[in-house]
Amino acid sequence: MPEISRDQVAHLAKLSRLALTEEELEQFAGQIDDIVGYVSAVQNVDAAGVEPMSHPHSIATTMREDVVHKTLDAAAALDQAPAVEDGRFMVPQILGEGD
């Protein structure tokens, strides 16, 4: 079974922009290693001839009545926004012009 090192967890944390303590790095290395072991065990199960399914039990689709409820109006939603322009949410630009 592959062992996940503390350095690999530190690298993943850096890529994810997570600040982890040394204790957390050791803890997560063990937990991730356990998860990899569980996945490996599942991959080794002989599932030949097993029909794919979404749920182990037969469940009839249940439908609920479509009822219209009062929702938040635009003015109330915009009232909670940090920035509004021309009646719309104003957000920072993430793409350059022409993108």
Curated annotation (Swiss-Prot):
GO BP annotations listed: glutaminyl-tRNAGln biosynthesis via transamidation; regulation of translational fidelity; translation
Keyword match Chloroplast: no
InterPro entries referenced in this protein's UniProt entry, alphabetically: Asp/Glu-ADT_sf_sub_c, GatC
Enzyme Commission number, as recorded: 6.3.5.-
Gene Ontology MF, one: asparaginyl-tRNA synthase (glutamine-hydrolyzing) activity
Record keywords, A-Z: ATP-binding, Ligase, Nucleotide-binding, Protein biosynthesis
Class of this enzyme: ligase
Secretion signal, residue range per the UniProt entry: none
Reaction(s) catalysed by this chain's protein: L-glutamyl-tRNA(Gln) + L-glutamine + ATP + H2O = L-glutaminyl-tRNA(Gln) + L-glutamate + ADP + phosphate + H(+); L-aspartyl-tRNA(Asn) + L-glutamine + ATP + H2O = L-asparaginyl-tRNA(Asn) + L-glutamate + ADP + phosphate + 2 H(+)
Highest taxon above the source species: Bacteria
Description of how the protein assembles with itself and partners: Heterotrimer of A, B and C subunits.
Family: Belongs to the GatC family.
Known function: Allows the formation of correctly charged Asn-tRNA(Asn) or Gln-tRNA(Gln) through the transamidation of misacylated Asp-tRNA(Asn) or Glu-tRNA(Gln) in organisms which lack either or both of asparaginyl-tRNA or glutaminyl-tRNA synthetases. The reaction takes place in the presence of glutamine and ATP through an activated phospho-Asp-tRNA(Asn) or phospho-Glu-tRNA(Gln).
Family annotation (NCBIfam families): gatC
Protein name: Aspartyl/glutamyl-tRNA(Asn/Gln) amidotransferase subunit C
Provenance organism: Corynebacterium glutamicum (strain ATCC 13032 / DSM 20300 / JCM 1318 / BCRC 11384 / CCUG 27702 / LMG 3730 / NBRC 12168 / NCIMB 10025 / NRRL B-2784 / 534)
Name of encoding gene: gatC
